[in-house]
Amino acid sequence: MSDLTDIQEEITRHEQQLVVARQKLKDAERAVEVDPDDVNKNTLQARQQTVSALEDKLADYKRRMADAVSRKKMDTKPTDPTGIEPDDHLKERSSLRYGNVLDVNAIDIEEPSGQTADWYTIGVYVIGFTIPIILKALYMLSTRGRQTVKENKGTRIRFKDDTSFEDINGIRRPKHLYVSMPTAQSTMKAEELTPGRFRTIVCGLFPTQIQVRNIMSPVMGVIGFSFFVKDWPERIRDFMEKECPFIKPEVKPGTPAQEIEFLKRNRVYFMTRQDVLDKNHVADIDKLIDYAASGDPTSPDDIESPNAPWVFACAPDRCPPTCIYVVGMAELGAFFSILQDMRNTIMASKTVGTAEEKLKKKSSFYQSYLRRTQSMGIQLDQRIILLYMLEWGKEMVDHFHLGDDMDPELRGLAQSLIDQKVKEISNQEPLKI
């Protein structure tokens, strides 16, 4: 289809089909006005879809035509014998060859990449959808996230579900949930949903629904998240009653021993930290929290809530804004991101390869999480992360899934049987199971 003549013929054919389709659409609209029954409404919907599809195809062919014309101009352009492009400022040719032309027309420098998202607008948009389509989209972007992103990179995808629709003049139309799948060069607008922003906002708004359906990202599954959240209320209660190494209470003479004991607990340190967080609120995030509180969302208001750790079940790349002012929550997410880095470091260490190849397999989830969360207006308390690591670190590392589920004794027995059989039938060295 690279030939200009063929493309022009396709454009002409599609333009003719579009004229006919638009006329049929007008006839269908008139029929619905006269008799708005189901048959006429379905016909109208089909006509609208046909027109939309033809418009998309026509636009695509016109883009192809523009590209083909541009290529033809480049091919016919006389080449400079010196090998220097006409608009290059160098007087002598560079030792480097000319590379790709990077088109920056689409970039808006008023909204640079990496900016803080407009969480209020994003939250209001997501809350406007039904729970089923939100959770199904979350499943596609977390449990099956790698596959979905790979198949749709560089496009703006639409999620569709029968539970999500809107009535326009009595006609039921699908209400699509839009998510942008950026490449490394993409510039995202403040209110634009990306997979990372979507996981962040949905995990923060609907942790109870995520818990009930057990939706979990693979990167959380392999660090033993299921084990960690199994008895969360008891786990966090025991943690709060432990002695905090960072507190040295000023005790007045005659203070009861029981009160002195209480003042040394982690709970008191968390109460002090909550006072600091209460002074650092951002207006837009407060507005989002108030808006969410008036609807269906189930954001935790305390780290001891049963659904609190489920905020991180789908591995959001930062602390969700709806619970960023709940003491200990942002640090809990940081603890999970460190565990992910620890597991990846273990996996990289046990693989065969050069030091450089092993380094490539390491990750920096923690640094990314820290940077993104702090861009939302709070500083993480490293001491709380340290308390989590001291309390649960060893236990969690023992529950990592390291891709080696075979019992050592079983592996040894199987290997000895392989060695014996290979020696019977061959003089080659047996491979390791």
Curated annotation (Swiss-Prot):
Record region (Interaction with host DAXX): 377-433
UniProt region (Interaction with glycoprotein N), positions on chain: 80-248
Chaperone activity: annotated span: 1-100
Viral RNA-binding: annotated segments: 175-217
The keyword RNA-binding is annotated on this UniProt entry: yes
Region of interest called RdRP binding, as start-end residue ranges on this chain: 1-50
UniProt keywords, alphabetically: Capsid protein, Chaperone, Coiled coil, Endonuclease, Helical capsid protein, Host cytoplasm, Host Golgi apparatus, Hydrolase, Nuclease, Ribonucleoprotein, RNA-binding, Viral nucleoprotein, Virion
Region (Disordered), start-end ranges: 67-92
GO cellular component terms listed in the entry, alphabetical order: helical viral capsid; host cell Golgi apparatus; host cell perinuclear region of cytoplasm; ribonucleoprotein complex; viral nucleocapsid
Domain of life: Viruses
Subcellular location: Virion; Host cytoplasm, Host perinuclear region; Host Golgi apparatus, Host cis-Golgi network
Annotated stretches, region: Interaction with host RPS19: 150-175
EC number, as in UniProt: 3.1.-.-
Motif (YxxL): 178-181
Record's compositionally biased regions (Basic and acidic residues): 67-78
Record-linked Pfam families: Hanta_nucleocap
Region (Interaction with host UBE2I/UBC9), start-end ranges: 188-191
Record remark on domains: The N-terminus is required for chaperone activity and, in trimeric form, this region likely serves in high affinity vRNA panhandle recognition. The N-terminus also contains a coiled coil region, which probably participates in but is insufficient to initiate N trimerization. The YxxL motif is indispensable for the interaction with host MAP1LC3B. The central region is involved in specific RNA-binding. Has distinct cap- and RNA-binding sites so it can bind simultaneously both the vRNA and mRNA cap.
Role this protein plays: Encapsidates the genome protecting it from nucleases. The encapsidated genomic RNA is termed the nucleocapsid (NC) and serves as template for transcription and replication. The nucleocapsid has a left-handed helical structure. As a trimer, specifically binds and acts as a chaperone to unwind the panhandle structure formed by the viral RNA (vRNA) termini. Involved in the transcription and replication initiation of vRNA by mediating primer annealing. Plays a role in cap snatching by sequestering capped RNAs in P bodies for use by the viral RdRp during transcription initiation.
Quaternary structure annotation from Swiss-Prot or TrEMBL: Homotrimer. Homomultimer. Homomultimerizes and binds to viral genomic RNA to form the nucleocapsid. Interacts with host MAP1LC3B; this interaction participates to the protection of Gn from virus-triggered autophagy. Interacts with host SNAP29; this interaction participates to the protection of glycoprotein N from virus-triggered autophagy. Interacts (via N-terminus) with host RPS19; this interaction probably mediates the loading of the 40S ribosomal subunit on viral capped mRNA during N-mediated translation initiation. Interacts with the viral RdRp. Interacts with host SUMO1 (via N-terminus).
Family label: Belongs to the hantavirus nucleocapsid protein family.
Name listed for the protein in its UniProt record: Nucleoprotein
Native species: Puumala virus (strain Udmurtia/894CG/91)
Lineage of origin: Viruses, Riboviria, Orthornavirae, Negarnaviricota, Polyploviricotina
Gene this protein is translated from: N
